[in-house]
Swiss-Prot record:
Has no detectable activity with D-mannonate and with a panel of 70 other acid sugars (in vitro), in spite of the conservation of the residues that are expected to be important for catalytic activity and cofactor binding. May have evolved a divergent function. Belongs to the mandelate racemase/muconate lactonizing enzyme family. GalD subfamily. It comes from Cronobacter turicensis (strain DSM 18703 / CCUG 55852 / LMG 23827 / z3032). Keywords: Lyase, Magnesium, Metal-binding, Plasmid. GO terms for molecular function: lyase activity; magnesium ion binding. This is D-galactonate dehydratase family member Ctu_1p00430.
Length: 399
């Protein structure tokens, strides 16, 4: 096989709306360029530095054909490994290499993987509201668009301390009452089933806001309403408690968006403590490890529901789609509507049609990148308030 030599690796940060999106571009001597998602919304400049100061000199001049070898080199070259900054940087390069390989092959990426397992992947999006009526309106709007899987949230993840029994002069943060949240969530599921019956698949994200005993209690209370899945009912560092959650409830459990390395997901999968893996593909290092993770999951009956938030590039969204179209145990794809400017910077991104995302048709990942427009919307960073989650006594809690 003729070598395809890496000539340059660049990293771009653009903020077309409220998210800093990180994109890696790999240029080759064959005139083919590839793009990958490296978005770490909370630390974008750290990722850019790692790509341009460390990965670019490491990989320039090497053969882009050898994706597995290059991934292993990026992973171990710094000796310490598997953190979110490094994994996202590696992901950007890894996705770009797969993009290049499938372009040179003249086929969409999912075909390079081995072809499709399904005609289309079901999609879900988010409905929310401060009141049930507001939530119903949000759900109705998604049903009108053809969605039959909807993530529902009543209220949001924290606010000011006013209205809570909190100390004087409360520390700024996203204040959150766990008991109130649990009660409201059970009421929400009851109301949704009363209004929409059983044809609507309801998903819900706890966002790791509970203590283990509360997680067990909530799982038991939600069981009669048959959620499609409950996500992140516990934080990763408390995942051993999922065995006890399992013993008390058959509610399907999803977890993984915060995972960085195989030691975090291996035991949960082989011991069947979760039903859906929710890993963020760039957060675990890109397509190369995602394929390995997917095959491990299939052996133990765990289905795929890759994390797909608004703070990922359309390149990352398309990668999720290629994986989902190909992998037999893919279940569903999260989809967040994009701004018009985001679509101009990243033309060709996947869309939802009547609740489904269909196979991409262009060679490669299939999403373009307009550098000129991207540079017109530069990075803008501010500390994130929503990750400063506080309990009613002011204690910081996992966000």
């Amino acid at each position: 096989m003729t070598p395809v030599i890496i000539k340059n690796i660049e990293c771009f940060i653009t903020r077309p709306d409220r998210h800093n999106l990180v994109t890696v571009r790999v240029t080759t001597d064959q005139g083919v360029t590839g793009h990958g998602c490296a978005t770490f919304q909370q630390r974008p400049l750290a990722v850019k530095t790692l790509v341009e100061e460390y990965l670019q000199p490491l990989l320039t001049g090497r053969d882009a054909n050898n994706i597995e070898d290059l991934w292993q080199m990026m992973n171990v070259n710094a000796y310490w490994r598997n953190g979110p900054v490094m994994n996202n940087a590696i992901s950007g390069v890894d996705m770009a290499l797969w993009d290049i390989k499938s372009q040179l092959a003249g086929m969409p990426l999912y075909q390079l993987f081995g072809g499709k397992s399904r005609d289309a992947i079901p999609a879900y999006s988010h409905a929310s509201g401060d009141t049930l009526d507001a939530l119903f309106a949000s759900v109705d709007a998604l049903i009108e668009k053809g969605y039959r899987h909807i993530r529902c949230q009543l209220g949001f993840y924290g606010g000011t301390a006013s209205g809570l029994h909190a100390p004087e002069n409360p520390t700024p943060g996203a204040w959150f009452d766990q008991q109130e949240y649990m009660s409201n969530t059970v009421d929400m599921f009851r109301a949704l089933r009363e209004k929409y019956g059983w044809k609507l698949h309801i998903l819900h994200d706890v966002h790791e806001r509970l203590f283990p005993q509360q997680a067990i209690q909530l799982a038991k209370q939600l069981e009669p309403y048959q959620p499609y899945f409950i996500e992140d009912i516990l934080p990763p560092q408390q995942s051993a408690w999922l065995e006890q959650v399992r013993q008390h409830s058959c509610v399907p459990l999803a977890m993984g968006e915060l995972f960085n390395n195989p030691s975090e997901w291996h035991d949960l999968i082989v011991n069947r403590r979760i039903d859906f893996i929710r890993c963020h593909v760039s957060q675990i290092g890109g397509i190369t490890p995602a394929l390995k993770l997917a095959h491990l999951c299939q052996a133990f009956g765990v289905r795929l529901a890759w994390h797909g938030p608004g703070d990922m590039t359309p390149v990352g969204v398309a990668v999720n789609t290629h994986l989902n179209i190909h992998l037999h145990n893919a279940a569903i794809q999260e989809f967040i509507p994009r701004s018009a400017m985001t679509d101009k910077i990243f033309p060709g991104a996947p869309e939802v049609k009547d609740g489904f995302i269909y196979p991409p048709v262009n060679a490669g990942i299939g999403v373009g990148f307009n550098e000129e427009l991207a540079r017109a919307h530069p990075v803008m960073y501010r500390p994130h308030e929503w990750t400063q989650s506080r309990l009613p006594d002011g204690t910081l809690h996992t966000p």
